Amino acid sequence: MSDIQEPLKTVIQILHDSHKGFMDIGEHLKDQQARSFFLQEASTRHTFERELKTAVGADEDVGGTVAGPVHRAWGDLKANLGGGDHTLLATAEQGEDAAKKAYEEALKSDKLPGNVRELLIRQQGHIRQAHDRVRMMRDAKAA
């Protein structure tokens, strides 16, 4: 991929990972409201990934990051060790931190086509809101 597409490839990979991560964590959460949010968010991330791939003409096989499977496995491991919802929510927040950073890096490029920039800005707004909601859920479970 060209140098303007490399940060976009990272965003696509993060979206792929977060789709899987939200799905995996959502399936382990005991809190039904959090579970519902996570499963819906998994669907949203899948949609975002498809939108961005279409906008930039990316192959279907971009795949996830090397850290993605490790991130998901760590969340599963903590759940299996009895870490519970708080630990899963903390894991998700770490993933959301990576997503926020990926969007920030991609948007630094002054070579992005207008339609791609607009798409990233729209998606980034949602990512920030989701991050804040995950953090609030995590903090509520810590109390």
Where are the model-predicted features located?
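Amphipathic alpha-helices that form helix-helix packing interfaces
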Residues: 11, 18, 25, 48, ...
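Alpha-helical bundle segments that constitute or directly flank the non-heme di-iron/ferroxidase center
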Residues: 2-29, 87-111
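General structural signal for alpha-helix termini and helix-helix connectors
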Residues: 24, 28, 54, 58, ...
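Preference for long, well-ordered alpha-helical segments
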Residues: 95-143
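Residues at alpha-helix boundaries and short interhelical turns
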Residues: 29, 46, 60, 110-114
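Conserved alpha-helical segments that form or flank metal/cofactor-binding pockets of metalloenzymes
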Residues: 36-68, 130, 134-137
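Alpha-helical scaffold segments that form or flank carboxylate-/histidine-based iron centers
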Residues: 3-11, 32-50, 85-89, 115-127
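Carboxylate-rich helix-loop segments that flank metal/cofactor sites and access channels
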Residues: 51-100
